[in-house]
Amino acid sequence: MNRRSVVFYLGVFGAIGALATANGADASARSFVAAIYNAYKGRSGNGIALDTDAALRRYFEPGLAALISKDRKEAADQGEAPTLTGDPFVDAADWNIADFDLALAETGPDKATATVKFDNDQKPTVIVLELLKLKEGWRIADIAWQRESETETLRGLFVQH
């Protein structure tokens, strides 16, 4: 095999490896988000309990998990309700979701955006999750909801508060 052939094959195998890595990141991010929303499907869908710090760390990147946890502790100390009172994954306190559509876009190395669309009790809903891949796996860096005519974010709730 001559030198050009070696260089050619190295390039081909490198491109195949890069493509496999990109598709792997896409598949793992998609699986992470789909697992969340599958917990909300159907009348018996219990959703995701975010009632412990461990649960927060399982789904959110450390900085956002810490903001939510700190807010809860401060609210409890003051005898008040926490800033986040509904479920951030469905932007509601109650849900009836038959199915969901998930679109995923990689936005950079170890970053992706997931757009989830569903009807909650016949109300069309769109949730956008900013994802970050950590050594533990994919985590949510922020969630955006369309409310009235403006967009609000989970992180924004705690920055304003």
Regions found by a protein language model. Name each.
Residues 60-123:
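Surface-exposed, charged secondary-structure patches
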Residues 35, 39-46, 58-63, 67, ...:
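Structured segments of extracytoplasmic/periplasmic soluble domains
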Residues 107-111, 115, 119-126, 134, ...:
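Low-complexity, intrinsically disordered terminal/linker segments enriched in charged
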Residues 10-17:
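Bacterial N-terminal signal peptides
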